[in-house]
A protein has these predicted regions:
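Divalent metal-dependent catalytic cores for phosphoryl transfer on phosphate-bearing substrates
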Residues: 28-32, 38, 45, 50-52, ...
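All-alpha helical catalytic cores of prenyl diphosphate-utilizing isoprenoid enzymes
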Residues: 9-16, 29-41
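N-terminal intrinsically disordered, low-complexity tails enriched in polar/charged
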Residues: 1, 178-179
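Non-catalytic interface/linker regions that flank or bridge core catalytic/transmembrane domains
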Residues: 1-22
């Protein structure tokens, strides 16, 4: 629980939107109704577990639980109002064509991924620098290679970036179902 100014308005934005019903992706991890919430909670569990484990105990000792929660639960806020449902024909087990729903992207705010989440969050609350950087860079080494120097420098300054990136990967590849 946080007393951060504006959190009530951010939570209202989340409740009124599709955060609880949106998928986390169109065809990969948690690509089902409620997948974004599921993924965010999985990242939260993976990230908070790191704080008490191995090398992360030292690296994250000064990072408040509140910051872990904000980063993990809101890192993909940019995926709200991002997906729509469309339909296509697909053969069922009997070989009969059926009209089936699938998720597609409708990016109304083409501002990047981590950057957009930071922008959306900061419409309501002020992020701490480590939170801002962690959310911005949470995709880690999937960034274009031209960004690797900046990413590496940022990770050295804020280990929370790497911890969130790893937690995101753990949730995606170890905790969630693929389609």
């Amino acid at each position: 629980v946080t007393k951060r100014e504006g959190m009530d308005k951010l939570l209202e934005f989340i409740r009124k939107g599709d955060f609880y019903t949106a998928p986390a992706s169109t065809r990969f991890h948690s690509c089902h109704e409620g997948g974004l919430l599921e993924h965010s909670l999985n990242v939260f569990h993976a990230l908070t577990a790191k704080k008490t484990t191995g090398i992360w105990q030292e690296k994250l000792k000064d990072v408040a639980y509140e910051s872990l929660a904000i980063c993990a639960l809101l890192h993909d806020l940019c995926k709200t109002y991002f997906y729509t449902t469309d339909y296509r024909n697909k053969k069922n087990e009997q070989g009969i064509w059926e009209r089936v729903p699938y998720y597609t992207i409708d990016d109304k705010i083409p501002y990047g991924h981590g950057e957009k989440s930071v922008m959306m969050i900061e419409e309501y609350i002020k992020l701490l620098p480590a939170e801002r950087y962690a959310i911005r860079w949470h995709m880690g080494w999937t960034e274009p290679k031209e960004n690797y120097n900046a990413l590496g420098t940022a990770m050295e300054k804020y280990p929370l970036i790497l911890a969130l990136h790893e937690a995101n990967l753990e949730a995606t590849y170890l905790m969630e179902e693929k389609q």
